[in-house]
Amino acid sequence: MSRGGGSYGEVGQKIDYVFKVVLIGDSAVGKSQLLARFARNEFNLDSKATIGVEFQTRTLHIDARTVKAQIWDTAGQERYRAVTSAYYRGAVGAMLVYDITKRQSFDHVARWLEELRGHADKNIVIMLIGNKSDLGTLRVVPTEDAKEFAERENLFFMETSALESTNVENAFMTVLTEIYRIVSKKNLVANEEVDSSGNSSLLKGTKIVVPGQEPAPPTKASCCMS
């Protein structure tokens, strides 16, 4: 499957799909910086902790389809163990982030994954991200530890640097392309289900939507390790 490029804010274009992806993980692991790098190609060294609900969008083109990625940040709620079920509702992808220089942030990954799977669709596409790879001399989480965890839990895995923009695009696009592949496959199967009168259950234009938009058929994804 070809991977599409992305725009940082085109207006008036037809959107084929809206995919909600959530960022989760301990505070100060760089979730907001990853979001800023992917959504706006920005990085702010003076970035303060995120306060309030926040999400950003980026329009992408995958296999000649226009996809709007809606990426949600925990908005600092994780500091108070206050991430709510509403945050996860409607998500078809998740970026589970830890800091390679903070062992505790990796040790908490299992708890975050349990919470995610307790609130989201059981087959949500998940990417485990070891952020701050630019700080390799301060590393305390071996890459192999994270790889083994990802393989055991059937997750994608990459190490990233929001500062240097290393693998940020790859990580998000891997998740979004996998979601698109799954949705496209479901649509293809549905389109082949033609009843005796010749009508097909065509799903072209179906969106995977987020709370506050019109309802759409539920999606199920299957995760796999790349």
UniProtKB/Swiss-Prot annotation:
> Could you confirm whether the keyword Lipoprotein appears in this record?
yes
Q: Where does GTP bind?
A: 25-32, 73-77, 131-134
Query: Motif Effector region, which positions?
Result: 47-55
Q: Which GO terms describe its molecular function?
A: GTP binding; GTPase activity
Q: Its GO CC terms?
A: endosome; Golgi apparatus; plasma membrane
Entry-linked SMART domains: RAB (SM00175), RAN (SM00176), RAS (SM00173), RHO (SM00174)
Question: Subcellular localization, per the record?
Answer: Cell membrane
Concerning Pfam families, the annotation shows:
Ras
Attached lipid, kind S-geranylgeranyl cysteine, located at C223, C224
> What superkingdom heads the lineage?
Eukaryota
Q: How does it sit in the membrane?
A: Lipid-anchor
Keyword presence, Acyltransferase: no
* Assigned keywords, A-Z: Cell membrane, GTP-binding, Lipoprotein, Membrane, Nucleotide-binding, Prenylation
**Family membership noted in the UniProt record:** Belongs to the small GTPase superfamily. Rab family.
Q: Relate the protein's function as given in its record.
A: May play an important role in plant growth and development.
- Record's protein name: Ras-related protein RGP1
Task: State the species of origin.
Answer: Oryza sativa subsp. japonica (Rice)
